[in-house]
Amino acid sequence: MPLHRLHGLYAITDPALTPDEHLLPAAEAALRGGAKLLQYRDKTASPTQREYRAAQLRQLCHQYHALFIVNDDPALAAQVNADGVHIGQSDGGIKAARDQLGGSRIIGVTCHGDLTLAARAAEAGADYLAMGRFFTSHTKPLAPPASLALLRQACQQFHQPVVAIGGVNPDNAPQLINAGAVSVAVIHALFGQTDTDAIEAAARQLSACFQTNRSAP
C-alpha cells in the first residue's frame, strides 16, 4: 500500500461547498495547489452519480500523482479502483472494508480525540488514524474537541500515520505538523474559498506548511 505517499495536504470535498457542477474544477484547483490526497465525500448524491464522479476524481487525482480516497463506501472504492477508503466509527468495520478492498488499499479510520478508539483501529489493521477536531470546525462544529497534547501522544504511541482534522487552516496547520501529524485534512479552508484561484492559493499555503515545519513521511 502506498503509505509513504500519505504525507501533506489532504483535501476533503463537501457537497455543500463543491456542488456537482463545481466539484471537478474545485478538486483540480486543490490538486494544482499541492494536495497529496483527495477524499470524495458526498452522502447526498445518487449511487449512479457517486460512481460517475468518483471515477472522474480518481483519474484527476492520478494525473496529479495524488491518492484518491472514498468516504464511507468500500464497495464504491473497489468499484472505481480508488487508492483507499475512509470509514467512521458508525460505518462498516475495518475487516469488512479490507475484505472488499484487499491488502493493497489504504483504510483510514476516524478516531475523534479518543486514544482507545485509535488503539482499536490500529489493532484492527487501519492504515492511518484520523484524529480531531483540533480547532473550531465549520463542517462539524459539534464534533468533540481534541488537544495538541493528545495528538503528540497519538503520534508517539502508534506506528500508523496520524492525520489531523478539524478547523485546519494555514495559520494553525504548523501546530499540528510540529506535533507529529503527517497530514492535515482540510475542507472549509480550501473549498470554502470564493473561486478556483483562491482554492489553489489556499492549497499552496497549506502545502507550504509541510516544507517549513517538522513532519516526516
UniProtKB/Swiss-Prot annotation:
UniProt-listed CDD domains: TMP_TenI (cd00564)
Superkingdom of origin: Bacteria
Bound cofactor: record note: Binds 1 Mg(2+) ion per subunit.
Cofactors (names): Mg(2+)
Pathway involvement of the protein, from the record: Cofactor biosynthesis; thiamine diphosphate biosynthesis; thiamine phosphate from 4-amino-2-methyl-5-diphosphomethylpyrimidine and 4-methyl-5-(2-phosphoethyl)-thiazole: step 1/1
An example Gene Ontology biological process: thiamine diphosphate biosynthetic process
Any one annotated GO CC term: cytoplasm
Residues that bind 4-amino-2-methyl-5-(diphosphooxymethyl)pyrimidine: 39-43, 71, 110, 140
Coiled coil: none
Keyword check for Transferase: yes
Cited InterPro entries: Aldolase_TIM, ThiamineP_synth_sf, ThiamineP_synth_TenI, TMP_synthase
Keyword line: Magnesium, Metal-binding, Thiamine biosynthesis, Transferase
A GO MF term: magnesium ion binding
EC id: 2.5.1.3
Catalytic reaction annotation: 2-[(2R,5Z)-2-carboxy-4-methylthiazol-5(2H)-ylidene]ethyl phosphate + 4-amino-2-methyl-5-(diphosphooxymethyl)pyrimidine + 2 H(+) = thiamine phosphate + CO2 + diphosphate; 2-(2-carboxy-4-methylthiazol-5-yl)ethyl phosphate + 4-amino-2-methyl-5-(diphosphooxymethyl)pyrimidine + 2 H(+) = thiamine phosphate + CO2 + diphosphate; 4-methyl-5-(2-phosphooxyethyl)-thiazole + 4-amino-2-methyl-5-(diphosphooxymethyl)pyrimidine + H(+) = thiamine phosphate + diphosphate
Binding site for 2-[(2R,5Z)-2-carboxy-4-methylthiazol-5(2H)-ylidene]ethyl phosphate: 137-139, 167
Residues that hold Mg(2+) according to the record: 72, 91
Record function comment: Condenses 4-methyl-5-(beta-hydroxyethyl)thiazole monophosphate (THZ-P) and 2-methyl-4-amino-5-hydroxymethyl pyrimidine pyrophosphate (HMP-PP) to form thiamine monophosphate (TMP).
PANTHER family on file: THIAMINE-PHOSPHATE PYROPHOSPHORYLASE, THIAMINE-PHOSPHATE SYNTHASE
Annotated family: Belongs to the thiamine-phosphate synthase family.
Full protein name: Thiamine-phosphate synthase
Native source species: Alcanivorax borkumensis (strain ATCC 700651 / DSM 11573 / NCIMB 13689 / SK2)
Gene that produces this protein: thiE
